[in-house]
Amino acid sequence: MRKFRRQLTELLSGLRRVSEKSGDCVLMGQGAYAPRSGRRVVACLAVCLSLTANFCTAQDAKADKVPKIVGAIPLAIETGVPIKLTLRGQLLDQITEIKVGSGDLKAEIVSKGKAAVPPNYDAKRVGETQAELKFTLPAETPSGRLSLIAVTAEGASVPYEIIVAKADELIQEKEPNDGFKTAQLISMGKTVVGTIHDQRTVDVFELKGEAGQKLTISVVAQQVGSLMDPFLTLYDGAGQVVVGVDDNDGRDATLEVTLAKSGSYYITVQDANDAGGPHFVYLLKVTQ
């Protein structure tokens, strides 16, 4: 980028000097020049556009040679316990290492190779290669976001961020949970790690609440690389809809509600387009 800017500056300076000597430009205020004729302006623009095109082509070619991480399963990991993680992206079958966080921790590469692309999805969006990793985060690792960087012989990817939680903050979804009678009981403050496994599938969770409680129920999916477009609905104990929501933050869903009465409530999570599969993963959290 610096070299490109320097070349462009030198070119423009040279054209200005030539134009000034030939009388094709008139000196304006504050050292600016205005052309007498449009010929040199056209020539200047043509050269500048050529330089810009060459620079962009070179940058694109370089970007095509370095790896890129587009998603991870699971979407969140815990500290202090062994982690198995699958990354998807471009050129991950060529990685030599995965850097974890800003320290010296590196993941063990268990396997790497090509990955099947789901029908009707762009390979650049979902990734056509994958890598399976193993590592353990120190227990003192703070909650929040953690960067992962894929490295090949050609260079390193831009950092990909994954959500980190303290031990026991994550709850794994348990099947079957596709109806009120089989709803999975969850607690406030915990994060459920779930998957919409098949088309036209609904995951149902039961929550105990008190009258007057103000709750925030959120689903995180697309903003952390999932293919899922979540639709979130809250039902009361009688199975009546309290509130439903599709998109809030991008294509993810959040709803805020004050409970009218005490008792059981049911939260349903599904894809807004009735899609499903191993890449339709999500995080569900209820806070007050």
Describe the role of every protein-language-model region.
Residues 82-86, 128-156:
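Ligand-binding face of N-terminal immunoglobulin V-set domains in extracellular IgSF glycoproteins
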Residues 162-172:
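Long, low-complexity ectodomains and other extracytoplasmic segments of secretory-pathway proteins
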Residues 1-57, 61:
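Intrinsic disorder/low-complexity segments
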Residues 157-164, 281:
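Edge beta-strands of extracellular beta-sandwich domains
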Residues 64-116, 130, 153, 168, ...:
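Acidic, Ser/Thr/Pro-rich low-complexity intrinsically disordered segments
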Residues 114-118, 122-136:
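Strand-loop-strand motifs at the edges of beta-sheets in extracellular beta-sandwich domains
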Residues 7-8, 15, 108-120:
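Internal, charge-rich low-complexity segments
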